[in-house]
């Protein structure tokens, strides 16, 4: 497994631009409705240029596995889960970004910008940076349902 860290805001801006161009094309062509029927709630934001994919995060880390790895999907998620916990402990905000994985799948430009070695595929994406908002307390969790 390898990690690709996007730490420069200029590079994140490149990812955003390519992704927004792709999203705009999909919105105009109505293809987005086929891939993601519940997209209606994001359409206005996409049309207004709001960053619905990367959430204005300044940084991103992509975990990639060799295409022939035995646990190619699970291992990256486990690794980034540890990083997620560590970053949260340092008061750095995180956001899992499954939409970016789809964007990488559909866009050769994004894959080229990602610059993964041949034979590797992005399997998990974690956005991170200092949070734009602060909460006085955590949200109350729902009761856990236990089945006997």
Task: Show which residues each predicted segment covers.
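Acidic, surface-exposed loops and disordered segments
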Residues: 1-148
């Amino acid at each position: 497994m390898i990690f690709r860290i996007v730490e420069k805001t200029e590079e994140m801006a490149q990812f955003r631009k390519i992704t927004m161009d792709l999203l705009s094309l999909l919105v105009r062509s109505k293809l987005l409705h086929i891939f993601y029927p519940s997209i209606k709630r994001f359409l206005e934001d996409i049309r207004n240029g709001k960053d619905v994919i990367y959430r204005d995060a300044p940084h991103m880390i992509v975990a990639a596995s060799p295409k022939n790895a035995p646990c190619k999907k699970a291992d990256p998620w486990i690794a980034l889960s540890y990083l997620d916990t560590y970053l949260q402990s340092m008061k750095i905000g995180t956001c899992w970004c499954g939409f970016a994985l789809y964007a990488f799948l559909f866009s050769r430009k994004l894959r080229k910008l990602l610059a993964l070695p041949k034979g590797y595929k992005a399997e998990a994406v974690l956005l991170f940076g200092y949070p734009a908002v602060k909460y006085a307390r955590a949200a109350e969790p729902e009761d856990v349902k236990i089945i006997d």
